[in-house]
Amino acid sequence: MKSDIEIAQDTKELPITEIAKKVDLQPDEIELYGNDKAKISWKGINRIKQGKKLGKLILVTSISPTPAGEGKSTITIGLGDAISNQLHKNTLIALREPSMGPVFGLKGGATGGGYAQIITMEDINLHFTGDMHALTSAIDTLAALVDNYIYQDNSLELDPNRILLKRGIDVNDRTLRKITIGQGSRFNGIEHEASFAITVANELMAILCLATDIDDLKKRIGNMLVGFSVKDEPVYVKDLGFEGAIAALLSTALKPNLVQTLEHTPAIVHGGPFANIAHGANSVIATNTALHLSDYVLTEAGFGADLGGQKFMDFVSNHLDKRPDAVVVVATVRALKYQAEETTDHLDEENIPALEKGFENLKRHMENMAHYGVPVIVLINKFASDTEQELSKLKELVKADGFECEVVSYHDEGSKGGIKAAEKVVELTNKASDFTSVYEPTDSVEEKISKIAHNIYHAKDIEYSDKAKDQLAEIKKMGKDNLPVIMAKTQYSFTDKKSILGAPKDFTLHVKNLALKNGAGFIVVATGSILDMPGLPKYPAALDIDVDNNGKISGLF
């Protein structure tokens, strides 16, 4: 079988103007970026809000993944193609933009795989329409303005040692996690420690993905907490007057991007916060726009259902025009064997006992999603190494727990690799649902953390570090303890330790620190060892990437 990039490069895309027509976007409602991608204009966004009935919303999430991932984006794209091209229903796919750092690191890109991809994958995985570069510029401009304020005036007596904002770069670079700036004479600024986070982990990314228009964007930027004064008073961006300039840098990036799949299904790709350290969903503008343009919208939540899935249900959906109508949980045979602590070099070997043991992980994710009161189906992403005995056993286990289940092979067959699955998903969206959140908006921070830990992770106890206790007291002092919580946790385990696999229970969850993201409107609760600046592996994907003299790129995946 051809590589992902070979398949993508061999596909003839339609002009993006033709894709826009499929969802009733007019020529003057898109802004072209070449022949194959466009931004949807404010004129288009505002026009489609009027009158049309909202489409059905299908959320795709997954079990706890292996380090290689389980093909959630591939399933989202393939399922969208199947609903569109096999069932002939008006469909739109809404996905996150890939971060460039992991493309050159371990994970690779995020445009699907095989015959279920969004294109052009080189553009989307690298520079695309420039959104990530605009975000990086905005992040670092804000940091520079804050440092200049301290150097030039500092009438609010902002303490340079208590600045909470981080600089940003869309590259995996562990050397930038902690640095000292302003070294040398005072001519170079005020010396103090600083740090970088990868662009998608910055609060401005979360703000971009939650803002509903430019006024909301500007308001959220103004509400960002910069740090504290020497008198222990909070200082916000609006206190310094920088929100207008930063919003101007992001005004174009706020418009969603329109592309297509290999099978020419329209797709909106916009925003990309990580799910293990942020809320892990594409922009609210993208999903709401898709809901107004089509009858069926497929979107995904990052990592497993305990991370992106939980955050989508309890947080993201509060900002959307509607709740999900159905949830798809993606599972793979190999990941379940991994959850049974089978070593990675043996995952391709048939092992029914390991599959049965690892099923406990999938069982918990299914039941967690079902507790939200929305219909749930499991789609098994078929790998070449899966045996018929393993696939049959997994379907049997899922159905015995009361859930629908289908095996799909969108990667190898495109939309034809799961027509029955598409029919079942569409059928599920018509079932009645009774949405229930894990926690109430009026719950305290501690209550919200406790309910997620007990009901989703199945932890017994929660242990707060002294630092976390101090930060919680500080948040309460500022009157911000009514905000939603976003858990930052390893994606590989229900616990805060990535080595504890399966479906553990009655463990202690360790809360290391809390961070107020006032502009985004949530509190990040960090558990275990979570990094917002990844490093590169010993053998980075960059070593396999090349470009020929005609500009044709190879090695991306």
From Swiss-Prot:
Entry EC number(s): 6.3.4.3
Binding site for ATP: 66-73
SUPFAM superfamilies linked: P-loop containing nucleoside triphosphate hydrolases
Pfam family for this entry, one: FTHFS
Catalysed reactions, semicolon-separated: (6S)-5,6,7,8-tetrahydrofolate + formate + ATP = (6R)-10-formyltetrahydrofolate + ADP + phosphate
Keywords carried by this UniProt record: ATP-binding, Ligase, Nucleotide-binding, One-carbon metabolism
BP GO annotations: tetrahydrofolate interconversion
Pathway in which this enzyme or protein is active: One-carbon metabolism; tetrahydrofolate interconversion
Molecular functions per Gene Ontology: ATP binding; formate-tetrahydrofolate ligase activity
Leading EC class: ligase
UniProt key word ATP-binding: yes
InterPro entries, alphabetized: Formate_THF_ligase, Formate_THF_ligase_CS, P-loop_NTPase
Annotated NCBIfam families: PRK13505.1
Similarity comment text for this entry: Belongs to the formate--tetrahydrofolate ligase family.
Protein name: Formate--tetrahydrofolate ligase
Species: Lactobacillus johnsonii (strain CNCM I-12250 / La1 / NCC 533)
